[in-house]
Amino acid sequence: MGTLGRAFYSVGFWIRETGQALDRLGCRLQGKNYFREQLSRHRTLMNVFDKAPIVDKEAFVAPSASVIGDVHIGRGSSIWYGCVLRGDVNTVSVGSGTNIQDNSLVHVAKSNLSGKVHPTIIGDNVTIGHSAVLHGCTVEDETFIGMGATLLDGVVVEKHGMVAAGALVRQNTRIPSGEVWGGNPARFLRKLTDEEIAFISQSATNYSNLAQAHAAENAKPLNVIEFEKVLRKKHALKDEEYDSMLGIVRETPPELNLPNNILPDKETKRPSNVN
């Protein structure tokens, strides 16, 4: 953003603030008789001056998440409820097929004791568990960060590495490929098995599929939501004995339509042989 662009941005900001100030003044003049509607000012995507998030159209960002500033989110990735990705003083990059689960925090480092500037780089097909904290670190492809883990400035988790739940990984630590680290401070625990390495990729795939269902549900307009409420009320099931006493035969409720890759394939029921 050049000098002229920043000037226009500042003027627009002042005009908006003036309007809000006039609204507050009018409310005070009305005394106890005024009505003020409480609106949430939460923004899922928010710029910081000229730094704006870039989110792939195939990615899912939950409505209650906050993606702020210089953040790039790749194809098929999912940012879940309550997450904060804050790229205000540096860059946050999230690859493809990665999931950052509920209430996690991803931030960047502009200054620290070592004097180094660290962006946060998260690779492809990474799983980051609930309430994890990533600060100025690098997480390579197909890694697993457990719930509540904390990764500090300069940490590097190599491909197929795993950080256990609740671990605290100190600054400038490097976790080699195929190893599990845990504890406070985190230290080497053991090698991953082949099955565990395969699980890392499968976990990312499962979350990408699940995100499609959440994206479809969150995209529904109000009229569709209200119509589905009526349908659910209509098809509410009561106790079979209660229905039989009243002689009621209820309609079978419709099945919830999910993408084919969300639920495991159901075996087709074969008709019983007729003797």
UniProtKB/Swiss-Prot annotation:
It is found in: Mitochondrion membrane. Its EC number is 4.2.1.-. Belongs to the gamma-class carbonic anhydrase family. This is Gamma carbonic anhydrase 1, mitochondrial. Coiled coil: none annotated. GO terms for cellular component: mitochondrial membrane; mitochondrion; nucleus; respiratory chain complex I. Substrate binds at R86, G87, D88, Q101, D102, N209. Its main location: mitochondrion. InterPro entries: LbH_gamma_CA-like (IPR047324), Transf_Hexapept/Carb_Anhydrase (IPR050484), Trimer_LpxA-like_sf (IPR011004). Residues 256-275 are annotated as: Disordered. Enzyme involved in the catabolism of H(2)CO(3) but that does not mediates the reversible hydration of carbon dioxide. Mediates complex I assembly in mitochondria and respiration. Its cofactor is Zn(2+). Residues 1-43 form a transit peptide. One of its GO terms (biological process) is photorespiration. Homotrimer. Component of the mitochondrial oxidoreductase respiratory chain complex I; element of the extra matrix-exposed domain, which is attached to the membrane arm of this complex. The keyword Kinase does not apply. GO terms for molecular function: carbonate dehydratase activity; metal ion binding. Residues 264-275 have a biased composition (Basic and acidic residues). It comes from Arabidopsis thaliana (Mouse-ear cress). Zn(2+) binds at H107, H130, H135. It is an enzyme of class 4 (lyase). Keywords: Lyase, Membrane, Metal-binding, Mitochondrion, Transit peptide, Zinc. The lineage of its organism: Eukaryota, Viridiplantae, Streptophyta, Embryophyta, Tracheophyta. It is a peripheral membrane protein.
